[in-house]
A protein has these predicted regions:
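Mobile, glycine-rich extracellular loop/lid and propeptide segments
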Residues: 119-121
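N-terminal helical cap/lid subdomain that shapes the substrate entry/recognition surface
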Residues: 2-117
Length: 121
């Protein structure tokens, strides 16, 4: 008998495709004068957010553009500055990407009805 089910909510049962963080990362970089592509933004998906930003800042094209725009290679202060734009942007748009995937709500309700515990990551 199944006793528990663990759901990975963000990007799996809601916001399938992780569009909210992708949009927030792209807007945070654009705010600092360095537009990034969706492909560049998606490459480090799954990392902690600051590590994601740091990884993007070390990508060859982004690093060169950052240096051209800001006159220096990206520093930890720059990671903090991009993150400071990213986090509030993400929270301001989450509701636009919060619709559950088809059958996610029904599945959770059925599991509860069956007495199966539900956890999340």
């Amino acid at each position: 008998m199944i006793e528990a089910v663990i759901f990975d909510w963000a990007g799996t049962t809601v916001d399938y495709g992780c569009f909210a963080p992708v949009k927030a990362f792209m807007e945070a970089f654009a705010h600092h004068g360095v537009p990034v592509t969706m492909e560049e933004t998606r490459k480090p998906m799954g990392m902690l957010k600051r590590d994601h930003i740091r990884t993007m800042l070390n990508m060859e094209r982004i690093a060169a553009e950052w240096k051209r725009v800001h006159g220096h290679e990206a520093t930890e202060e720059d990671v903090d500055a991009v993150y400071a734009q990213f986090e509030p942007k993400l929270f301001s748009i989450l509701d636009q990407y919060a619709a559950p995937k088809p059958f996610a709500v029904e599945t959770a309700a059925k599991l509860r009805e069956m007495g199966v515990k539900i956890g999340s990551t």
